[in-house]
Amino acid sequence: RFTKNNIVEPALRGNIYDCNYKLLVGSVPEYRLCMDFKVIDKDSLARTKAQHYRDSVFLQSVDSIAMGMHAIFPDYTEEYFKERLMKGFNEKKNGWSILPRHMATFIEYQECKKLPLFRERPYKGGFHGDEQMRRKKPYGSLASRTLGSLYRDSDRVAKNGLELAYDSILRGTDGIKHNTKVRNARVDFTDRAAVDGNDLMTTIDVDIQDAAEKAIVAQLKNLDAELGIVIVMEAKTGDVKAIVNMSRDANGN
C-alpha cells in the first residue's frame, strides 16, 4: 500500500553582485520551527504504535527540549518553551509553530535538531522546519532603489528595480518531486529537478555607491534641497558605477 503526493521544489533565486563580486542581494534560508503532535497514518495499528512512541518520548523529554531551546534562543525562557510545547501537545496540533514570531536561521535549526525527540526523522519525532527563502541585502539600503525588491522578502514575485528587470534570469524554474509512502517508510523521488536562477553581476561598485550616497545626503542637508540625483559613469567603458536618487521623506529628513 502506498500514497503519493506531488510537491513543488522551488528554484533558488540568483544573487546580485557588484562589479567586484561583492554580494548586494542574496537568498538566505530561514525556518519556521514546527511540531506535529498527531500521527497521521491510515494503518490504525501503525498509527497507534507511532503515536504512543511520540507521546511518551515527548513527555519524558519536554523539560530537556525547553532547556535546550532556551540555550539556542536566549530571548525566550524555558517556561515559555515548555508552555508552548505542552499547549500543542494537549491540543494534538500538527504544524504547531513553536516560535510564531521568530524565524530560525539555518544554524539555529541545526542546533534544534540535536535535541531529544527533535533529532528523530520528522515522520517519527514530529519536529520539522518549514523553509522559506528570504531576500537579504548585506549593505542595507545602499543602492536599494536600483537593486529593487520583491513584493515580500519571502515571496518570489519581483516588484521593481533590477529584481524586476532581470526577473527571467534570476528566478529559475521550479521542480517537482514526489513524497511517496510505502507502508511505514517515506521516500522522496525527483520527477523534475529545480533549475536555480542565474546570478547577475552589475557594473555598480559598492564603494563608489557608498561615497556617492554620503555625498548627496550631505549636499541635500547643506542646500536644504528636496531632491538630488547622482550618476557616476566610467568614461572609457560607459559602465555605471553608482546611481543615487535621494529625496526628503514626509518628516523632512
What do these predicted regions represent?
Residues 9-12, 19, 26-32, 124, ...:
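Extracytoplasmic
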Residues 201-203:
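Generic structural detector for well-ordered beta-strands
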